[in-house]
Amino acid sequence: QADPAIQVQGVSKSYRLVRDRPTSVKEAVVRRSRRQTVEDFWALRDIDLAIPRGSFFGLIGHNGSGKSTLLKLLAGIHRQTTGDITVNGRLSALLELGAGFHPELTGRENIYLNGAILGMNRRQMAAAVDEIVEFSGIGDFVDAPVRIYSSGMYVRLGFAIAVHVNPEILLVDEVIAVGDEDFQRKCLDHMEVLRSQGVTIVLVSHDLDQVRDLCDRVAWIDRSHLVEVGDPGGVCDRYVASVDAEGREE
């Protein structure tokens, strides 16, 4: 069996939370003798996951379960606290609205900037820029500073860049839900094209119908732990049953 596109072994991620932080200098002096408590919040615990090359891989779970944290670790934006992550291939990611954009630069300048970050040279980006602008549909706004963009324009340009830099692995958090329905359809259709070209796609989504339609494998993450990985139909059904059961308990 070929190496997976992404291998995650024993990965955990913790963040330090400082409790009882003073709100003013005076309060800090008055309370100097009282100790602040520092707690570790574990966003992910002991995750083992292999994402096959060329797969369309879904991540599902409640808000705050750890899905987006996992994507940020895979993209190298954050570093895991323990464990190993191996990424085999050139990775492009669309994770947070406006991430990777410099607000004072124009859309066109940001296209070149993002290309450089992803290892594309200026000539390669010059060849792709017209296609990126056309796909994004933002027209003349490409020469305006991105700080004036709407959230929808950010998504359009971000997605257009992410899919036109020849990625071998594409990570997409739910940001495309911000775009209008036509653009969402365009994004999903383009991801299907990339998949047919052998690109590995990892998608975080709350739209379970979308996950069932698009994905060939799904991982369910709950409260920082990996519950199961498997066939989209079965995993989504068990996830829905668990949400329903929790709803009845409340």
Language-model features: where?
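Pre-NBD coupling/linker segments of ABC/ABC-like ATPases
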Residues: 1-45, 232-250
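Conserved H-loop
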Residues: 207-213
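Conserved ABC ATPase "signature" region
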Residues: 26-33, 112, 124-141, 158
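Conserved catalytic segment of ABC-fold P-loop ATPases
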Residues: 213-220
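Conserved ABC ATPase "signature" C-loop
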Residues: 223-224, 239
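The feature captures the beta-strand-to-loop junction immediately N-terminal to the Walker
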Residues: 60-62
